[in-house]
Amino acid sequence: MSDKITVGEAIARTLEQYEVSAMYGIISIHNLPIADAVGQRGNIRFVPARGEAGAVTMADAHGRFSGLGVALTSTGAGAGNAVGAMIEALNANTPLLHITGQVEKAYLDADAGFIHETRDQLGFLRACSKRAYRVNSAEQAVAVIQRAILDAQTVPCGPVAVEIPIDIQSSLVSSSVLSQPVAPAPLPAASDEAVERLYQRMKQAKRPLLWLGGGALACADAVRKLADAGVVVISSTHGRGILPDSHPRSLRAFHNSPSIEAILTQCDLTLVAGSRLRSNETRTWTLPLPRPLVQIDIDPAAANRNYLADEQINGDCGALLNALAARLSPGEKVNAEWDAEIATAIQQAESALRQQSGEYAKLNDAIAAALPQDGLLVRDITVSGSVWGSRLFRAISPLCNIHSLAGAIGMGLPMAIGTAIAN
């Protein structure tokens, strides 16, 4: 019995090893060996799309919940159609694998007019991805796929593209090319020195502020403990729900509200955890943030990108926030008068937003009443994305309120489909 399998089957088996449950895509002559193998084996659900942007968007949503989304597209125009959705996944730091085809090896980069050929496909994939790879030999295909998955799942996560020439996809290789999945390295533990410095800053502050971003999505328990201890919490739109709106010290995502800005000006410490401090949440970086400002991010390149920090801590938000929460006593920073000011400011911010939203506030309330308490809201951009959906609609847990971070229009429906399948 031969141990030979096609590269397409080797890729399908590899994805199964990574416990991929769904692949989103469009079947084409330039990816048939992979699509055939997935279909014939029957272990991965293939979800067809009407366009490549929709396929990658569905995979993006799936990856946000499952830890790895997978999309399959065609060469040239097909891969190009995926670019906008890849940019969204890049903004959201979604662990996503985008597999696309290429013309036969003999015609690569020849600009010969081969069907589906485009100039510098790898170049535009690099521009919209965390990493992009080309498979140059059949024997290396599985290794490159594993490298791509490792890159996608390594924090900070992101979409990774792999292009595979069609003749390589159909080539036969020994099943010995298959190997065990490679897991990302564990995140670093919080250093005692960094935790001690954070604790001393927190101890000295009377009105500390915690600003959360998408990099803190897995930190809900630590954030709640800090809020219970008296720390005021505000989040990016992507970070909403890490601390439920119902918590009395949650400023939600009311960054641009005058009443909330008045609260921020009274804080005497800002701890930024896993946030880019994006332009639309900081009035294009003119919003004054309380000093001292300490930034926690796993990515050293995040340091001082938009605001000059008094201290940058390169590390895992979860490890550092958990260690800090363990040092604070319950209610250590609680102040009844301060809590009353916070409650008034939140009420004023919500009232002003309801007035600004007009009839949309009624739509918001109707959806909230119809949706189960643990239901998920997925929305498009424009009014639902930028006004009532991002700030008024309730958020009770991380990723319960999905939106476009890149500002792309039209991603709502495929994002909702991917979210539903992942859940």
Q: Whereabouts are the PLM-identified features?
A:
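Glycine-rich, anion-gripping cofactor-binding loops and their flanking helix/strand elements
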Residues: 44, 64, 214-296, 394-423
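Structural signature of the thiamine diphosphate
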Residues: 4, 21-22, 64-100, 126-178, ...
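Thiamine diphosphate
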Residues: 33-107, 269, 274-278, 386-423
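Glycine-rich beta-alpha junction loops
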Residues: 27-30, 103-104, 164-170, 214-216, ...
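Glycine-rich phosphate/diphosphate-binding loops that line cofactor/substrate pockets in enzymes
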Residues: 10-20, 61-66, 151-156, 194-209, ...
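Active-site diphosphate/adenylate-binding microenvironment
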Residues: 8-19, 26-29, 34-41, 341-422
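A cross-family phosphate/adenosyl-ligand binding-site feature
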Residues: 2-58, 166-197, 225-241, 245-266, ...
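Phosphate/pyrophosphate-binding active-site segments
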Residues: 1-3, 139, 175, 200, ...
